[in-house]
Amino acid sequence: METRKKIMNSAFELFAKKGISFSLTEVASEVGIKKASIYAHFQSKEMLLKEVIDKELKEYFFEINQENDNLEKIFYGVLDYYNNSQTKLLFWKRLLLLPPEAIEDSILDKVHKLSEDRFQIVKELIVSESKKGRIKINCDEAFCLMFFSLIHGLLSSELIYHPYNIREHYDIIWNQFWLSIKK
């Protein structure tokens, strides 16, 4: 089982760096096994990639869904998930922006469904805060779109600019977002 895990970890990192163009020979080399040994664990490169994606989907949505009761916790939770591993950020960018043709539509459908569920959770929190009089009313859809646009922008900035202390940027953006929506 240890070899299987190493194969998956290697494929994860190689997909993040190279996209679908990584080879099983590279995976085998990183793991320290022969290419043929990979087939004892996975039927094909596509099956390996499918399992890698499915595992990351579960980990990502499990981790970020731990803090669903507060907008600020969700904001920092998503950003911190990626801040802890640039490989994860690259993996998700490649998966969402340049999905491999070999990936089944069902996997991308699952990503979109889970993302839509998270969007609804944020929207419900915004509506709840609005009803409590803490934030402006009748702007829940716009605030939700702004919330996720800020997160996606910060994540892209991390890849483009490699800021020295991205956490400071998170704090500045969060504070400005909150100031713009609070009553």
Question: Where are the model-predicted features located?
Answer:
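Amphipathic alpha-helical packing segments from all-alpha helical-bundle domains
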Residues: 65, 103-132, 141-145
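Helix-turn-helix
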Residues: 6, 10, 14-47, 51
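Short, Lys/Arg-enriched anionic-surface-contact patches
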Residues: 1-3
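Amphipathic alpha-helical segments used for helix-helix packing
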Residues: 84-106
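Hydrophobic alpha-helical connector segments
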Residues: 51, 62-88, 143-147
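C-terminal peripheral helix-coil segments that are non-catalytic and often amphipathic
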Residues: 73-84, 120-128, 156-183
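Hydrophobic/aromatic-rich alpha-helical bundle segments in the mid-to-C-terminal region
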Residues: 93, 112, 130-176
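Hydrophobic/aromatic residues within well-ordered alpha-helical segments
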Residues: 45, 52, 56, 60, ...
